[in-house]
Structures are given as structure tokens and as C-alpha cells.
Amino acid sequence: MSENTTAPSDNITNEQRLPSGPKDDVDTLALTSAQNQANSLRKLDTDANAKALPSITDIPVSDDSDIKRQVGSGFGSNPLHIKDSEAFPHSSIEALKEGMDKVTKQCNDLKTALLSKDTSLTDSVQDLFNSLKVLSHNQSVLENKLDDVMKNQVNTDILVNNLNERLNKLSTMLQNTSKVNHSNLLIENSSNNTSSQHNTSSSRRGPGRPRKDASTSTMNKLVSNAASVNLKSASNQGAPFSPVNITLPTAVVQTSKSKRYFVEPSTKQESLLLSAPSSSRDDADMSLTSVPQRTNNENGKERPSTANSSSITPTPVTPNNLIQIKRKRGRPPKKRTVETMISNSTDTIDKSDASNRIKNEIPINSLLPSSKFHQIPSSPSNPVSQPAPVRTSRSATQEIDIKSLELASLISTNGDPNAEDSNTTDTVHNNVEGKVNVEENKTEKEKIITIKSSSENSGNNTTNNNNTDNVIKFSANSDINSDIRRLMVNDQFSLSYDASGNITVKLPPVSSPAAATAAAAAAVTSEMNRQQRELDKRRDSREKMLVNMKYNDRDKAKSFMESNKKLLKAMKEEERRKRMTSIIHDNHLNLNLNEISTRSKIKSAEKPTTKGSSMSPKPRSASISGISDHQQEGYQPLEQEKLVDIDNEGSNANSDSLKMGLTISAADTVHKVGIQSMLNSGEEAITKENAEYERKTPGDEETTTFVPLENSQPSDTIRKRTAGDDGALDQTENTSISPKKRRTEDHTKGEEDEGERGVGNSGTLATVENVSGDISADLSKGTSSIHNDTESANDSSNGNGNLGLGTESRNTLLTATPIELICREGFFYRRDIPDVPITTGAYLEFKFKAKEEELINSSINEEDYAAKSKHEKMNAHFFKPDIQEETELAFEILSKTTLTEKYVNSLEYFLMEFRWENKLVGLGLKLRESKRTWQRRKALFALFEFWRDQSRDKRRFHNYTILHAVKEMENYRIFINRSVSWFYNHITLLKMILYDLCDNVTTQWREWMFPHNETLPALGQDGINEDNLNETIDNMLIFDFLDDGSENNQVKYSRIIPPDIR
């Protein structure tokens, strides 16, 4: 400011010099004619100058206008002076210019000073606001810390209380122990006194250490001390001990990650992001400046925490100081698409750098030709290349977990001079790949990849050298790393399937197995990314919703139903209409079914152990089940109907003892009994059993096959029944009475019939042959134990009519004869037959068949079904006749599939297992699972029926069966990447989506469906039989761009050929 204040004084000085010019120029003026006039003018000029030049202190600060005005006033009144100035203007104008320049410069300086002051003021205000932001953020951090401190205080109080309870409990235990010890010491003291008196009286002592003299006094002291302790702890008796389940708060106690650490606002957050585990990647979008390490000794492990946030200096991010974010509860999210798999961790960076080093050292373009090939013979110029099969597989125990690639054997060089260099290169590659895999195994487990040198001696050595390829085989049934398992066809590789379903990729001749592995891994990654993107593009909006749904996300399902109320209402209306029409439609078959049921009872009395579906002679009461979530078709019965047998002549004499007033006239018999027989799943099973029994020959009775029910005319059945009535009338009367009477008569007969049945069952089961043709050596051994358990259970239940302990265990356990299987590379083998893997049908028969025979034998002596509690009534699913036939056919075809670990988690296996479980539940089995779970499993089978009916009616697939429905639903399950349990927990949602697809078949055809312009494969057409129907259906359901899905990439189950290990 001093410069600005002194500047005007200079201007004043300049202004004072301005009139001095005319004073000096008076002598140089030209002479005039009038000398007086000149003198007067000189005097006037002098007076004017004296008036125009005041003192320095009196001159005010003025701008340019004042100067101009003063100059004008000084020269305008004197024309002669102006003329003199025009004559000599140079000195005055130059002085004026200098003054003007100085004023202009000083004005500019003043403007610059004002602007700089304004900018500094603005910056100060901005800093103030930033400081306020920092203070606000620190305030929130301190509030969170205070909240943690309060929680710590609460937890500390609870722990102190629990510690007090434990001390009280301990004092009580010490008191009780001291009382017992006191009584024992008194007894010992009395005995010791008597023995010491005896010893002192005797002069001879026996062997052993002599007793101390102060033993009695020491024991007395101990007793007195214990008594004093008991008196002190008597008043501290506390509540009974309860376990403490409270843990101290961690760094993630209800505190958002954005508030957990202090971040300076001026720091760039993008450069400070830390990676999180994949299970909690959606919550890991936080930025950290500095994370001081604090270790809490909790559960014996050290974990990083966040106690101090004062440091601002960034800490280098290393794997040692990464924040250990706690994984959320529940199932971790699946890897949906490649776009969502973003990793920022340092181990991924190291792995990519190592992979880049491998690519730089082994360029893939130099290993592979630009064109696609199938078989490339090795040229004489490359004698080093030998076949290097790389086969990925896993052990049966699933315990193989490595951290580097292992070289099984070196490549044979056949005398090549470059062998030493080649081996050196292999060692370098193996070291680099080992480092890569060490980093990869920090985040996921990987299976071993063994590189072997194999010489295919198909002829002589010359032939072997001319047909040398590098073959990489990936096992289709092994649960290995998905990146390696998803190698598909691209421009550099030739892919094919061998007999075992393994994926074989042929490479051109390379110099080392490490090069082949690197090339295959690169191809796997690129192809997998492309296929994942392609799969995600082909999913519609609803399929993407199902893929991205969490397992128990019911809010999304409810919102979908709320937004599609019209669709839900139309679907339920159609289901109700079908339920009503199905009863009327099936009434014409009811009398026929009733006749068959009566005759089947006669046959089952003669042959109590047939191979079809078993009858259930227990009385049932009819009611319809209703479960929540709209998951049932509605026609599944909760309780089975009472059995009613009516003779052809209309005689109802033996049915007078039946309850609920079912003795009706012959005119009303057809309608009422028809509904009862339709609601009775037991009689449908009896129909199946009788049809199987008549078609069997004596030589086929020992094989376990499931022949579908053949349609027979009602007239033929009545004619056969009339012909057989004369010979079997007495037995018909005995079988038509109520189960309660029959149980009473059997009880009066004693143990004879039961013993005969036991012998018959043992003889039959001893020759049972499973589906795969293997005779079980253990099944007949376990049959006698089953029969003995049944007899003991029956003996315990005959006295009071209630279920005893043996019956409870019998109805709860499914496997009376456990099966010991060996798992090897995803296949299951019996211990007595370790060469041939077991089939699914054989496994299920081993699991359920013995229980079925046991339930058949024990059902006669069980109590009435109506007397059971509601919890015990686990109702069987009702099969309509056509559904029953198609289900048995599907079971017959699918039972030939080899059992694998992946097949157990499929809908096909669910169908086969549900068929067995439903049969046993109809016989009175109580499953270990809850009733709600069983209802949902029944609803899933009802979903198959729903899709089958919709496909027949709206998709115009007239030969569509349950087998087609299950295969297509399995394809749909793979397409949306969901589990079987997810299916029967989202029945209504799936029904709505499938119902809408069937309403718009022409516009909404999906990739997982059967082709709409082709004929469905069925038995009897184009040479299709039961042996090749399953594979034919699988061939129609393969995706164009994938094998059978993204996450479930595997060979179709029908094409799996187990390896021959013999």
C-alpha cells in the first residue's frame, strides 16, 4: 500500500513542471511592432503562472482529466502562449506522455493487487469449507468409534456377569465335592484308626512303605480347610451354567465401509482402492489412505483392524496388509458372466505379469498355425516333438490340491543333439508356471495337471514318428478348474470327444509340454469368455432374472407375481378347470380299476413279493391337501381312501363292516367308487402290479424290470374276472373284507403264515438281480435281518396296537442293508465288483427295495391309518394312470444311466428317487425330511406334469411324455444355472414363466427347448427303442454354441461311458 500512496506525489511534481516551459521560452519569442504590448503580455503571463502554481501541499490528487483541464485553462486564455507552444511543443508533450504512462501503470498495479487479494480470500473460504468437511467426516468416524465403545462396554458387562455365574457354579461344585470328600475322609479316618491300632499292637509289619507319623494330623487339617471353604462359598450359589455366545465387536459391526476409515478429501480415491474377496466384492468399493495394523488375538488368529486413523501418508498395498473383509452369511455368489469378474488384487496382477512373461517367451502364434487342423504329422525337421498328453482328472477322495505344475516324465528325445537345450527350456517354463500357479492357488483350489510322455506304438518306430501329435485331454466328468475344463473349438485347436466323453484337443508339434499347457490355457480363457458373453446374450430378461436371483430371494419372486397378476390368475383358473374335468374324464375307467384291484389282491395273496408297485392294504381317509406358495396341482391327496371291493354280481355282503357308510346301491356304485379309486394311489399301484405279474414268465421273475402298463379294454377285464370268479370266490371274499378284520384273522392264525412269508421273501430276495445285471451278494444276507426286525416289531405292536420302538425305527430308516460304494473319478463302484460302475437304477434298488419288502410285510399288523397323528400322515403323490405309465417308462429308461456325482444333482435323478420315495410313502414310510419339504418335492413332480400337459395342449407335441418333460426341464435348469432344490422352492414362479412361454410358442421359443419344427423322438419310430431313446433326446437338446451350459459344462449323461480300469 505504500507504493500506492506515494504515487500521487510524483504526479503532482510532474504537474508542477508543466507551466515552466513557457517561462523559459519568453526570450525566444519573435519581436512585435508594439513593444508595450509585448511587455504587458509578459506581465500577464507571469501573473497567470503565479496563480496557476500553488504550493505542493495545496495541490490535490487528480486524474488525467484534471491535468487536461488545468492545461487547457492555462493555455486557452492566452492565444499567444498557444502559438508559442505550437512552435515548440516537444518538451511539454513528452513530459505529459511520461506522466500518463506512469498513471496508467499504477492503475494497472492497483487492479492486479485487488484481484490477487480477492483470489486469496476465495481460497481461504474454500479451505474453510474443506476443513468443515474434514471435521464433519471426523465427527462421523468418532461417532462410530463411540458406538463401538458402547457395544464393547455392553459386551464386557455381559461377559462379567457370565464370569460371575461361572464362579458361582464352580463354588457350588466345590461345595458339593467337599461334602463328599468330608464324608469319605471320616470313613477313611475311622478305618485308619482301627488299622493303626492293629499295627501298633502287632510287632511285625507287612511289605510296603511305612506310614508317616503326621498322616492323621495332616488329613484333619485338610478336612478343616475344606469345611471353611464350603462355609464361605455356601452363600454364592448362582444360577445354572449357560454357555457364553457373545463375541467382542469386530471392525465390521454395523458400520459402513465408507465411514470406517478417514480419507483426506484431496486424495484421489481411484488410486487407493483395495481388492476384496470374490464373495464380498459387491461391498468392497471403499478407498483407503492408510490402514494402520492392529492385531486382536481372537480365536488364535491375528487379523488387521482399524483403530487409528491419524496417519495420512499412503501405505503401499501388499498382500500382507490387505483388509480381511468378513464374508457374508450364506452361499457365495456364482460367477455369472465374465464382465462382472473384476479383480484388482495384487496377486492377480502378479499372475497376469507372469502369464505375459510366458507369452513373450512362448508366442502362441509360433506354436500354432493360422488355419484349423485335425491331424498334423510331425516333419523330420522337428524330431524333438513327441506326443505329450495332458489329462486333467481328480482322485476319488477329492484331496488333490497342488500349487505348481508337476512334470511326470521328461520328453524322450530319441538321440536329438538339442535335447539338453530343450530340457533346459522345459525347466524354465515349469519354474515360471509354478510361480503362476502358486499365486493362483491363493484364491482357489486347482487340480493337478500331469504331463506324461506317451509313445503310441501302433506299428513300428517309423509309424510312431510320422504320427506324432500333442494331445491335451480334459476329463469331462472331473470337477476341475472351470478355466481348464471349458476348452471349446476355436480357430487354432481341433476338438473331439473320445469314447469316455473326454474332450481331446490336438496341438501342432511343440518343443515342450509347458508350451502346450500355456497355449491350451490361453485358448481356454479366450473361448470361455466368448461363450459366457454369448450365453448371456441369448438369455431373455426373465432368464437373466432367474440367473441373478439369490437362493432365498423371495422379494423378487413376490414382486414378479405382483406385476403379473393377470398371468397368475389365468394359470390358476386353467389348473382349476383341469382338476374339475379330470375327475369326469376318468370316471369311465373307475369300474375297470376297481375290478383290477380286487383281482390283484388275489394274486398278491398267492405271490406276496412281486416286482411291480406294491399294494397298500391300509385304510385311508380322503381329503385334499393344500400347501402354501401355490405349489401344488391340487389333486394330490392328503389321505388315501378306504378300499371298497365290489363283486360283478353286485354282492356287498362282505363290505358291511366298512366305516363311513360306504355300503351303497349298485346304481350309485360306478360314480362314487370311481372317485374313490381315482383318489387312491394304492389301487393304481395294484393295477400296475397285476399287469406286470401276468406278463412275466417264470424265467423273468428274478430280474428287476419295470414294464409299462398296457391299456386293456373294460370288457376284457370283466370277461376274465367272470371266468375266474368260480375258482377264486372264497379267496375273493377273504380279500374284500376290511384290513382290520383281516388283521384279526391273521392274528388268530398265529405265526405260521408269517413264517411262511418270511421264508418266501428270503428266497425271492436272495435271487434278486439288479438292473445292471450284477447279482448282489450282500442283499440276501441282509434280508434275514430285515425279517427278524419285522417279527420283533410285530411282536411288540400286537399287544397294545400302538407302534413300538422297533416299528418307529423301521419306518424311519430307509436303508436296512447299507451299501458300501467306492468313488473313483466321479464314478461309483461296488466293493465286490470294483471294475463296473453301478447304474442309477441298481443303486436306487439297493437303497429302497429291501425297505419296500419290509413295509409290505409289516403293513398288515400296523394300526389303522385313521388313528395316526397328523405328523405321521406323509401323503403320497397321486399318479393318474397315464402319468403312472409314463413315469415307469421314464424310470425304466433312465435307470440304465451310469451313476455319477453330477447326475445325483440333476432333475432326472430326482424323478427316479421321487418315484421310489412316493411308493414307500404310500406304504407308510416316514421320511427323515420335514413334511413341508416332502410337499415341495411333490410339487416339483407336479411341475413336470404341468409342463407335460402344457406341451401337449399348446405346443402341439402330442407324443410328449414325462420323460420329455424331465429332460427338457433339466436342460432349462442348466441354462439358468440353478440347483434342484432351488427348483422345488420356486415352483409358482417357474409355473408362471413356463405358462407364459406356452401361450406364446411361436414368438418365445428358447434355446433349451425342443426344436419346434421337428418331431419328438418316441418309441417305435425311426428305429428308436428303450436303449437309444435317452441319447436321441439328449442329441436334440444340445445347445448350438455350448455343450450343455456355462457353469455345468459336461458331457450329456446318456453319452457317458465309464473308463475300463480292468
Curated annotation (Swiss-Prot):
Region (Disordered) location: 1-27, 188-217, 267-337, 370-398, 595-634, 681-804
Q: Does the keyword Protein transport apply?
A: no
Bias (Basic and acidic residues) ranges: 685-699
Task: Specify residue ranges for compositional bias: Low complexity.
Answer: 189-205
Q: Which GO terms describe its biological process?
A: mitotic cell cycle; negative regulation of meiosis I; negative regulation of transcription by competitive promoter binding; negative regulation of transcription by RNA polymerase II; positive regulation of DNA-templated DNA replication initiation; regulation of DNA-templated DNA replication initiation; regulation of sporulation; regulation of transcription by RNA polymerase II
Give me the stretches of Basic residues compositional bias. 325-335
Superkingdom in the source lineage: Eukaryota
Phosphoserine carried by residues:
S378, S379, S628, S681, S712, S738
Q: Does the keyword Transcription apply?
A: yes
Keywords from UniProt, A to Z, are: Acetylation, DNA-binding, Nucleus, Phosphoprotein, Repressor, Sporulation, Transcription, Transcription regulation
The subcellular location is:
Nucleus
- Give the misc comment: Present with 149 molecules/cell in log phase SD medium.
Describe, as the record does, how this protein assembles with itself and its partners.
Answer: Interacts with RFM1. This interaction is required to recruit HST1.
Q: What does this protein do?
A: DNA-binding protein that specifically binds the regulatory region of middle sporulation genes (MSE). Required for the repression of middle sporulation genes during vegetative growth. Represses expression via the recruitment of histone deacetylase HST1.
Name this polypeptide is given: Suppressor of mar1-1 protein
Which organism encodes this protein?
A: Saccharomyces cerevisiae (strain ATCC 204508 / S288c) (Baker's yeast)
What gene is it encoded by?
SUM1
